[in-house]
Structures are given as C-alpha cells and as structure tokens.
From Swiss-Prot:
Metabolic or biological pathway, per its Swiss-Prot or TrEMBL entry: Glycerolipid metabolism; triacylglycerol biosynthesis; Lipid metabolism
Protein name from the UniProt record: Wax ester synthase/diacylglycerol acyltransferase 8
Compartments reported by the entry: Cell membrane; Endoplasmic reticulum membrane
Transmembrane intervals: 196-214
Source organism of the structure: Arabidopsis thaliana
Class of this enzyme: transferase
Role this protein plays: Bifunctional wax ester synthase/diacylglycerol acyltransferase. Involved in cuticular wax biosynthesis.
Superkingdom to which the source organism belongs: Eukaryota
Main subcellular location: membrane
Tissue: Mostly expressed in flowers and siliques and at low levels in stems.
Organism placement in taxonomy: Eukaryota, Viridiplantae, Streptophyta, Embryophyta, Tracheophyta
Sample GO molecular function, one term: long-chain-alcohol O-fatty-acyltransferase activity
Positions glycosylated per UniProt: N238, N252, N353, N397
Family recorded in the similarity comment: In the N-terminal section; belongs to the long-chain O-acyltransferase family.
Membrane topology qualifier: Single-pass membrane protein
Length: 488
C-alpha cells in the first residue's frame, strides 16, 4: 500500500477545487492517426507516479493533496461508438461528447483527471483524445510542460519535443535611457514609479468595485445567473501564426497585443450583427439596414490570465517539480481586468493600437500580483467559502476571459501518434464566452467555449477573428508596412 503523504494546495488551487466553482480544464488533442488505447495505458502506468498531482486525491476539506494508489484503467475511457451515431459527421459527435462531459463531475474519491479516447475522424484529425482534469492540478503553462515531457519530435522520434525558449520579463527602462545621465534617469524613475502606484491604485479600486457592484453591460454575449450550470460547447479554428508575427513586427508590438486587437475587432463585428438582428425583429419583421447597431458606452471587460513566475519561459518538467523553482509547477498565475473596446472602426489598425496601449498600461501595474496576494490572505482570514464567493462574483460581473499559451514549435508525437492540434479550454466558470489561444507548429488555435443557450453560433466569432486578421494584414500591406516586417 502506498504511503499517504499530504501537501497543501496553492491559493488558486483551493479556489478552483471549491464546490462553488469546481473549475475544470478540458484539452482536446487531435491526432493524425487512430489512437491505440493499449499504448496510452502502458505510457500512463510507467509515468503517472512520476507526477504527484496525477497520483494524489483531495483531502476531505479540500486543503491538501494526499498521495494514493492509481488504477490507470479507471481514468482512461474508450467509449463504444455506434456507427449510426456518427452518420451526420464525426466532428458533431465529438463536439456533443465533450459537451456532455461538462455535466459529469470528476470523482473526488480518486485523482481528479481522466482521458477519453475517441477514434472518430473529424474535420481536423483522424482521432481525438480528450484530457480532463480539475484546474487545481495545474495551469496552462504546467500542462504544456507535461506535454513536452511525454512527447517526441515527429521529425526525429528519438528526440524529445522542442523545448520552448526561456523568456525573461522585459525591462521597463529603455536602452536609450540607460545611456543618459543620472539626472534624466532619476526623473524617469520617479515618474515611472508614480505612474505605477497610480495605475495599481486605480486597478485595485476597480477590482473591489467589480466584486461588489460594478457590472458589465448586458449584451448578447453575457451570460445570466445560471450560466455556470449549463452545458458548454467548444469550437476551435486554426489561423496562421506567421500572419500574426508579421502584424506584430509591422506594428512593433507583442503577439498578445495582436491577439487582443483581433479579439476586439471580431467581438465588435459579431455584436453589431446580433444587435442588428434584434433591432430587425423588434420592427415586426421589417428589415432595415444599419451601419452601426452597437449601443453607446458598452462596458465589456475580459479577465486575462497573467503568469506570475519570475521565469516566464518553459522549463523541463523535472525542473518545474523542484521546490522553489523559478518556473514551478502548479497554478502560479493571477487575473487582470481588461476593458475591451467594442466599437466599429473604419481603420482596423485602430483595434491594434488600442490593444497595444491597453497592454502597455496593464504591464505598468501590480494588479495581478496583488490580486494573488489578496486571495492568499482572504483564504486565511475569511476562509475558502467566502473567498470563492467573492472570486465568483468578480467573474459574474465581467463578460469573458481570454488567455494565450505557447505550445510546441514543431510537430510532436505521442508514442508514434502525431499530434494535429492542441485545443485547451475550461468549464465551471460563470461566463457564456471563453476564448483561448494556443500556438502549435506554426499555427494558432482559437478555442471558443460558449453556453449555446446564449451564443448558438460560436463559429461566427471564429469567422470574424479570421476575417479581422486578413483585413489587418491587407491594410498593412497596402500601406507598405509589411514589406519592412518581412525583413525582420
């Protein structure tokens, strides 16, 4: 019998496993070949005990991990698939299967994860593996490190997957200022510090206001009180990562800036159509043409995940598991609130400029670190129930959440099974819309998670994102800005 050892949960893990939230990650991985279940079982039997989170269960009070025996067969599900069930298409079957999973809770008497093998051909893959686990086990960065540790390069099966380069946080002091005299440097430092303090105070005031009373505008994308208990549906689309990098270089911004600009443009277009449809219905079926159907002064905010590790690049799994590692395993991230601009712009580059300015400001604030610290203090002072209630209220009062995770740079394979795409998301949240971006092998996968009773057509949001990317690239080309970007 395995000795039971206990380890406390991190603050974010305690929040995520709370019955009032019970946030679960669900990762849809497409493969280019059919999946051999025996290969998956053998690999898990050899490796599951190397990772304590996947061989531990929660204590009864939800505060500690307890190591336990793992019967791998209980965690790997290979459902019988009736050919008649996929007569309308494999993609529809997989989508419905994953949607039903969001209504089935994980068994808390054993480690909080399972794997579902669906040997069904879809639009993008020959077979699909669905990995589901309680978000208390890990965040997106930790999961990708686990993927890298379990896979090999498709181009060279003898080599482990390409490690993603280590990324350091950018300095807030420009190189030109470092070369100036001490007086100008001191003036800049004082001004920058004052701005940092002011931004942090404003952000924390808005955070508390959001938890207590400040709500987003009720739009066709905002869910109601029961959205958390409704089933979720998932939709994903691949776009070119090279196109995103071209725009990034041409506009002198980051990939996150570009993705946020695309998100603002796409959601503005989608909402404009939804409002047009509602206006037309209200006029007894008389169709009218509107250029701008958006209400004035829409408050539309997104929670954005922020990695709190001092080393924000990826590290080998073994290094992440070491105590006091600068890039450690777990849920070491926090949230910031981004006020998205929902408006119709004649110049699509306006969305990019707005996102760049917004992200530059958020980087000059301690909101993320303070939010994590306050959650930690609140758990000690108020307890888990009160803390999760405040956290959930904060989520309910904003409209969506957005995240971006770097994936492997080259195509990878799991024991001879080449991976076609990686599409992560989550459920258990109080939003009708969730947006995840994941890069993999030269492509960016957009994953949209929706409550279908609120958003029946998530594919149209992806259409708008794809069209926004094309439009931005075309405008930059017309203005001659992409020619310089190609040289970078």
């Amino acid at each position: 019998m395995k000795n039971e050892e206990e380890e406390p949960l991190s603050p974010m893990a305690r929040v995520f496993q709370s019955p009032d939230i019970d946030l679960c990650a669900i990762i849809n991985i497409g493969f280019k070949t059919k999946i051999n279940p025996d290969v998956v079982l053998d690999a898990l039997k050899q490796n599951v005990y190397k990772h304590p989170r996947f061989s531990s269960k929660l204590s009864e009070n939800g505060e500690k991990w307890i190591e336990t025996e793992v019967n791998v067969e209980d965690h790997v599900i290979v459902p019988y698939i009736d050919p008649e069930d996929i007569c309308e298409g494999g993609q529809s079957f997989v989508d419905d299967y994953i949607s039903r999973l969001t209504l089935i809770p994980l068994d808390r008497s054993r480690p909080l994860w399972d794997i579902h093998i669906l040997n069904v051909k879809t639009s993008y893959a020959e077979a699909v593996g669905v990995i589901r686990f309680n978000h208390a086990l890990a965040d997106g960065m930790s999961f990708i490190s686990l993927v890298l540790a379990c896979t090999h390069k498709t181009s060279n099966p003898d080599m482990l997957s390409t490690a993603i380069p280590s990324v350091k946080r950018r300095s807030t002091v420009s190189h030109s200022l470092k070369k100036t005299g001490w007086f100008l440097t001191a003036i800049f430092t004082i001004g920058s510090t004052m701005r940092l303090i002011w931004n942090t105070l404003v952000d924390m005031f808005l955070l508390f206001a959001t938890m207590l009373f400040l709500k987003d505008t009720k739009t066709p994308l905002k869910g109601g009180a029961n959205v958390r208990s409704n089933p979720k549906t998932f939709y994903h689309r691949n776009i070119s990562l090279d196109d995103i990098k071209l725009i990034k270089n041409a506009m002198n911004m980051t990939i996150n800036d570009v993705l946020l600009g695309i998100t603002q443009a796409a959601l503005s277009s989608y909402l404009n159509r939804r409002y047009e449809h509602e206006n037309n219905n209200e006029e007894d079926g008389v169709l009218t043409s509107y250029t701008n159907n958006l209400p004035d002064r829409i408050r539309f905010r997104a929670g954005c995940t922020v990695n709190l590790r001092s080393d924000i690049g990826f590290k080998p799994l073994a290094e992440m598991m070491v105590k006091d590692s600068k890039c450690r395993w777990g849920n070491y991230f926090s949230f910031i609130i981004l006020p998205l601009s929902i408006s119709l712009e004649t110049d699509p580059l306006v969305y990019l400029n707005k996102s760049k300015a917004m992200m530059a400001r958020t980087k000059h604030s301690y909101q993320a670190a303070l939010t994590y610290f306050l959650i930690k203090i609140s758990l000690k002072v108020l307890g888990a129930k009160a803390t999760t209630s405040l956290f959930n209220q904060h989520l309910m009062n904003i409209t969506t959440c957005v995240s971006n995770v770097m994936g492997p740079m080259e195509e990878i394979s799991f024991n001879g099974h080449p991976v076609a795409y990686i599409s992560p998301s989550s459920y258990g949240h109080s939003h009708a819309l969730l947006i995840h971006y994941t890069s993999y092998a030269g492509e960016m996968t957009i994953t949209i998670t929706v409550d279908p009773t609120v958003i029946p057509d998530p594919h149209k949001i992806c259409d708008d994102m794809e069209e926004s990317l094309k439009t931005m690239k075309a405008v930059l080309w017309e203005r001659g800005l992409l020619k310089e970007a190609y040289k970078v």
